[in-house]
Structure formats: C-alpha cells, structure tokens
C-alpha cells in the first residue's frame, strides 16, 4: 500500500492512501462471506442461503458501501502503522464518501485522502534572557492576629441577650415568609422557621438584616425589599418582595480569652507565644510561596509569548473534558449542584470559557516541555522516589504507585524548568500594588464556575 504524507494546519497529518485492487476485492469478499455465514433468510438455515440471494436480500449497494467503510478504516490503521505516525486520533476522511463509493469497484485500485491529529510542533523563540516583572506578596504581622481572631470566632459560643433591641453583630432567631409584591404569591424557598442569621451587612439581600436591627424579641415587622438584578436565581432577579419577619430570640457571640489555655485547646502548643511563633513562620512561608507563584506565572507568560504552537483539536478537546470534569467535582465538593451551573443555556458560554483555558494550559505545558528537551532538563528517579515517600505521608487516601510517580515527576520537572528559566532571565521584583506592564504580569489560575448559587430562594445576597 502506497502512502504519502503532507502537513496540514492545526497539527494534522494528511495521508494520501493508494489501495491495491486485490485488497479492495478482499474487503468486499470478506464482507459477503461474513454476511452469508450469519444471514437469516426465510426458507434457509443460517449460513445456507446462496450468494446471489444474500446479495439480493441485503442489497448490493448497501454491502458495497459497508465494504468500502471497512476498507477505509483498515487501510487508515495500516497506513498509520506503516508510516510510524504518532497519531493522537481524530481520523477524518478528506474525500466525500459518496464520491468514493461511486469510484469503488472491488478488484480495482482505490485512492483516498484522510487526515489525523499528531503531536504539535512547538517553536520556541528567545527563551533565555526573558524580561520578567512580578509582584511580591509581603508578610504582615496583622495576618497572625487575624488568624487568631478566626480561631476565636470558631470557638465562640452564643449566649442569650435580654432586655435590649437587636444590634449589629447579634445572631437573630427569626421566622420569615416572603411573597412577591406584584401578585402576593409565595416565593418558593423563601420561608423558614427558627432561622439563625448574624446581623451583619451583606449576609442576606440588601435591607433584610438592617430591617431587623432595632426590633425587640417577640416583635414582628414587614420588610419591603428588592432582589438584586444579578441574583443567582433568575426568576427572582430584580423582583420586589415583602418579607413578614418575627424576631423570636437574640444571641450574642462570646469569644474565648486569648491566652495560654486557649492556645493549648486549639493546638499542640502549650503557650500563646509558641502558637504565635508557629503561625508567624507559617504565614511567612505562605507569603514566600505566593511570591514564587507570581514569579513562575510571569515567567510562563513571557515564555508563551515567545512560543508558536498549532494545537490539534484532539488535545484541546481532551483538555476541555478534563477541565469540565474537574469543575464538576469542585462544585460538588463545595456543596453546589453542578446542574445549576452546567445548564443548557449556560453551556455555550461555559464551553467557550473552558476552551480558552484549555488552549492556554496546553500552550504553557508544551512550551515548558520544549525547554526541557532543548536544555536536557531531567529529574533523577532517586528524586522521584524520595518525593513519592513525602507524598504518601501527606495523603489520607490510597493512590497507586504509578499515579504518584507521574505526579511527582511532572511536579519536580516543572520546578526544575522554572528554576532554569529564572536563572537565565532578567527578573524585577515590584512592590505590592505597583503596576505591571501587560504581558509580564501574573496569570491567575482559570476558574470555570462563577456566581454559584444557594439551593434555596432565601433572601441571600
């Protein structure tokens, strides 16, 4: 079988295949024999009907079309193997099947054109001496105070409030029922009993918590409110509503004292001073990690700007599918029903967002891999083995050795490539908030699902 290749756009390899007459005949005869062997024709036992009757019963043109389809499929697989083409998939016939069927005569040669996706060629521009600017994430002592305050909030207990009206910061226990102002119909999910809400701005739709402030326990009121125009549940966006609210109880947070006893209760440290020292070191390490992440993102962005690659559709589609599944799992872990995001109406926009993210991720990955090949950057297996041991100590679930090895190898190789690029680039560290020129700044990780909604139509903001 004669095969000639030609490069096509989008990292496709064009194949011009010439099939010998004997092979075109074999494809047809094999199909006829197989059909005769399994044919069930009235008046004949399976496989006993004569050839002409089988051809007449199933239709000569139908059998010829099926034989051609089989011939094309087997010839393409043979051509890819014969030419040692690293196919990614997405085999496509470039000729019209109907036109080929008109030319196909069993026993006569047949030529056709096809295409297959292959690994893209990555062309690196100037990847040494990149000029990179990125911002520092500073450590601030206030972060430790904020974290300790969060711990106090988590250990806070609610105690009853008596003899005064509701104030900002109280936790109110209320009954409420919402109706639409226009027709008086109940708002689905807009009713609750013994509902606890902290009286802080922004906890519910504008005006709800504010309307409770000043109420006495046992009082009732009616709040005339409006759902925001960008409310997640579209049927309520911009809708005027009335909420009948009854204040049943008031509570206030009682925070634990910040002392050595508190430190011992929430950690392995015996003193508050030791806990503070640990948190300070932790915050400093996190700030350094974020600063490095900014550096890495800026390097990658500059590298991609110097890289040319024509992405094949197969790789893009695989990456889109991976991102979609990842987003689906992330939403579930956040307690959000993915079907509320991946709706039929939203899917075109979601797919477009995923596609852009997928192409960017692929370009980054391919560019880094090309640098590794060009500079012979590798990770020693001893290093991978040591990293696997570390990962196992951090993981709670059982993960296969192969999966851990692949993850560790990829993680460590990426780190080595970025360190090499950093050593061979001109890097400028900017102050927090200082403007960074387009093209040299940091890329935030792509987020797919935005505007996640609560399952109930309660007056949440």
UniProtKB/Swiss-Prot annotation:
EC annotation from Swiss-Prot or TrEMBL: 5.2.1.8
Record localization: Cytoplasm
Reactions this protein catalyses: [protein]-peptidylproline (omega=180) = [protein]-peptidylproline (omega=0)
Keywords assigned by UniProt, alphabetized: Cell cycle, Cell division, Chaperone, Cytoplasm, Isomerase, Rotamase
Spans annotated as Disordered: 432-461
The PPIase FKBP-type domain, residue ranges: 169-256
GO MF entry, a single one: peptidyl-prolyl cis-trans isomerase activity
GO biological process: 'de novo' cotranslational protein folding; cell division; chaperone-mediated protein folding; protein transport; protein unfolding
Origin superkingdom: Bacteria
Broad class of the protein's primary localization: cytoplasm
Broadest EC class assigned to this enzyme: isomerase
InterPro entries: PPIase_dom_sf (IPR046357), PPIase_FKBP_dom (IPR001179), Trig_fac (IPR005215), Trigger_fac_C (IPR008880), Trigger_fac_C_sf (IPR037041), Trigger_fac_ribosome-bd_bac (IPR008881), Trigger_fac_ribosome-bd_sf (IPR036611), Trigger_fact/SurA_dom_sf (IPR027304)
A Gene Ontology cellular-component term: cytoplasm
NCBIfam families: tig
Family: Belongs to the FKBP-type PPIase family. Tig subfamily.
Domain comment in the entry: Consists of 3 domains; the N-terminus binds the ribosome, the middle domain has PPIase activity, while the C-terminus has intrinsic chaperone activity on its own.
Function as written in the Swiss-Prot or TrEMBL entry: Involved in protein export. Acts as a chaperone by maintaining the newly synthesized protein in an open conformation. Functions as a peptidyl-prolyl cis-trans isomerase.
PANTHER family named among the record's database cross-references: TRIGGER FACTOR CHAPERONE AND PEPTIDYL-PROLYL CIS/TRANS ISOMERASE (PTHR30560), TRIGGER FACTOR-LIKE PROTEIN TIG, CHLOROPLASTIC (PTHR30560:SF3)
Protein's recorded name: Trigger factor
